[in-house]
């Protein structure tokens, strides 16, 4: 993009995009701002502003009704601006309407937490990281989201990582465990849950300014959606004095002196000093904007806002219905894949069973072969026995025929007969033993064959059943899916969730509770995370904010309990307390 003598190149960076424009020399801040919001489709413009770095290196908000070129923007081509949230809602769930608004806030707050601009305790950091993963990647899928999947994602403040002796894999496992808890949560809903938890952090949405009281004590002034708070120099987590916007009647400054006039006319002015006049200008602009939004929230919505909310509800309902249809389709697919896997497992099991039976059959055949060999040996032994018996019979006949034989010859023949009888006895014993063994083997073979035939029939039947998908499953699944889809559509057609507001609350802090205090499940999650992280915590890496937070928790403080406490008493008492700090 080339700038002419009458045009200037401008680059505007949002939290997730870069936009480039060519503007005229006379273009005002509002004209540039309007061009940006039109390009990104943003309608909740009251929260946002254009930020630039001035010639002194400070971040400054562009003035809408002054020409861009007349403001103290660092010269360059292109001119650089950031599109950022300038004001924060009191309650994100009540006020944020458009998805684009939600996304921009989510990205800005997440970046502030990860860079430690907003202090976040370790257990809350891990829980927020799990919502961030859901917002980016959707539902956890074991097949897709394998170990190491989150390795390149920036999910935790470096402070938290340094304070725990845990590997990257251990951090990923911890975050993934909680990520799985968010299954079915829309990405936009995950962003909202993130912000609902983040807005209870003490430093969320607070703009801090260095100030001094009349005594010259260095302090912090915190400006946010709920009012003004005073902090000691070493503790930006725990405000010591607070003034809700409803108590403030007038704001002004004179040079470095800033004056706040309370509604209570008996109370003295609240006066402090800023280091530079330009700081007072920024404080004034933030006070005016936050006060205006504070009062606007307590009035009925304009027609434009009502239309935006109605449109957002319709879009959310339509998106929810599409989500439910998709979930039903995915569930049906998972059931079908599960059944298919079951059939494949059964088929594989039956095939393995058949292979085992085949192996057993081969073993039985080997046994039969050995039995046949044994039978052959028995038969051979019987034949040998019969031959020896014949030989003995012949010898007995010879003995009978040689009664008159000499004594020596007769004795020799008798000895041969005795030896032959012993051989026959031994062979007879072997035949008997082999006969018994053959009979036992024969019985075993018959039993094995009988069992093999029976099991083979059952295995064949099971194998046949496993390879044929029952038809009634298809019919049943189809009917179930159709019924579930119809029920799902009927269940969401009448569903509606309005952003409830109570315009009669004078000071919202009085009835405000942290999400953790209102949500027992969140309490349990944070408690479990804290216990898990304690096992690997390195106390030597504890920061001053960690110590302050730990002490606040020990004393039972949280953001809103502290705000209620510091707003007690009349305005005069609090102004006097400030002067004496």
Curated annotation (Swiss-Prot):
Domain FERM as annotated: residue spans: 8-298
Comp. bias (Low complexity): 459-469
Region entry Disordered, spans: 452-519
Record localization: Cell junction, Adherens junction; Cell projection, Microvillus; Cell projection, Rhabdomere; Cell membrane
Main location: other
Compositional bias of kind Acidic residues: 477-486
Segments forming a coiled coil: none
Membrane topology summary: Peripheral membrane protein
UniProt-listed InterPro entries: Band_41_domain, ERM, ERM_C_dom, ERM_FERM_C, ERM_helical, Ez/rad/moesin-like, FERM/acyl-CoA-bd_prot_sf, FERM_2
Biased composition, class Basic and acidic residues, residue ranges: 495-519
Keywords: Actin-binding, Cell junction, Cell membrane, Cell projection, Cytoplasm, Cytoskeleton, Membrane, Phosphoprotein
Modified residues (Phosphothreonine): 562
Entry GO MF terms: actin binding; cell adhesion molecule binding
GO CC annotation, single: cytoskeleton
Pfam family membership, one: ERM_C
GO biological process: animal organ morphogenesis; establishment or maintenance of epithelial cell apical/basal polarity; neuron differentiation; positive regulation of early endosome to late endosome transport; positive regulation of protein localization to early endosome; regulation of cell shape; regulation of organelle assembly
Top-level taxon of origin: Eukaryota
PANTHER family: MERLIN/MOESIN/EZRIN/RADIXIN (PTHR23281)
Annotated function: Involved in connections of major cytoskeletal structures to the plasma membrane.
Subunit structure: Interacts with cytoskeletal actin.
Protein name listed in UniProt: Moesin/ezrin/radixin homolog 1
Organism for this UniProt entry: Anopheles gambiae
Taxonomic classification: Eukaryota, Metazoa, Ecdysozoa, Arthropoda, Hexapoda
């Amino acid at each position: 993009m080339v700038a002419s003598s009458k045009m200037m190149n401008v680059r505007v960076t949002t939290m997730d995009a870069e936009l480039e424009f060519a503007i005229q020399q006379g273009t005002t801040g509002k004209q540039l701002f309007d061009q940006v919001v039109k390009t990104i489709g943003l309608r909740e413009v009251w929260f946002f502003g254009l930020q630039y770095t001035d010639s002194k290196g400070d971040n400054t908000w562009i003035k809408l009704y002054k020409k861009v070129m007349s403001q103290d923007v660092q010269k360059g081509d292109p001119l650089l601006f950031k599109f950022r949230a300038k004001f924060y809602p009191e309650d994100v769930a009540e006020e944020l309407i458009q998805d684009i608004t939600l996304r921009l806030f989510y990205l800005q707050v997440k970046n502030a937490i990860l860079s430690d601009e907003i202090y976040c305790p370790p257990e809350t950091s891990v829980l927020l990281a799990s919502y961030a993963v859901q917002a980016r990647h959707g539902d956890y899928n074991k097949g897709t989201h394998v170990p190491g999947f989150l390795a390149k994602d920036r999910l935790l403040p470096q402070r938290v990582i340094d304070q725990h002796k845990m590997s990257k894999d251990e951090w990923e496992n911890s975050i993934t465990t909680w990520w799985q808890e968010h299954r079915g949560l829309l990405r936009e809903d995950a962003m909202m849950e993130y912000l609902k938890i983040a807005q209870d952090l003490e430093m969320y949405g607070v703009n801090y300014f260095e100030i001094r009281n009349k005594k010259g004590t260095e302090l912090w002034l915190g400006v946010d959606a709920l009012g003004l708070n005073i902090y000691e120099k070493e503790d930006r987590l725990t405000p010591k004095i607070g003034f809700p916007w409803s108590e403030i009647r007038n704001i002004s400054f004179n040079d470095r002196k800033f004056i706040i006039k309370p509604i209570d006319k008996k109370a003295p002015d609240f006066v402090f000093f800023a280091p530079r006049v330009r700081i007072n200008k920024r404080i004034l602009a933030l006070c005016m904007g936050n006060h205006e939004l504070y009062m606007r929230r307590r009035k009925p919505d304009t027609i434009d806002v009502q239309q935006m909310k109605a449109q957002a509800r319709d879009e959310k309902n339509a998106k929810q219905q599409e989500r439910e249809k998709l979930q039903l389709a995915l569930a049906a697919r998972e059931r079908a894949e599960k059944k298919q896997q079951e059939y494949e497992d059964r088929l594989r099991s039956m095939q393995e069973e058949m292979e085992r039976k085949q192996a057993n059959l081969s073993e039985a055949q080997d046994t039969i072969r050995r039995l046949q060999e044994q039978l052959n040996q028995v038969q051979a032994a019987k034949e040998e026995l019969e031959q020896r018996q014949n030989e003995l019979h012949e010898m007995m006949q010879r003995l009978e025929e040689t009664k008159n034989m000499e004594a020596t010859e007769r004795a020799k023949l008798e000895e041969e007969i005795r030896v032959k009888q012993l051989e026959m006895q031994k062979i007879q014993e072997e035949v008997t033993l082999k006969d018994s063994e053959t009979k036992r083997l024969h019985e075993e073979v018959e039993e094995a064959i009988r069992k093999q035939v029976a099991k083979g029939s059952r295995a064949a039947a099971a194998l046949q059943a496993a390879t044929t998908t029952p038809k009634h499953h298809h019919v049943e699944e189809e009917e179930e899916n159709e019924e579930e889809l119809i029920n799902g559509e009927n269940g969401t057609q009448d569903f509606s969730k309005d952003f409830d507001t109570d315009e009669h609350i004078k000071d919202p802090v009085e009835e405000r509770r942290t999400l953790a205090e209102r949500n027992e499940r969140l309490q349990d999650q944070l408690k479990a995370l804290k216990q898990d992280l304690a096992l690997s915590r390195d106390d030597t890496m504890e920061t001053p904010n960690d110590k302050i937070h730990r002490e606040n928790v020990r004393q039972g403080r949280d953001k809103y309990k502290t705000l209620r406490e510091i707003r007690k008493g009349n305005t005069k008492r609090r102004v006097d307390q400030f002067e004496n700090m």
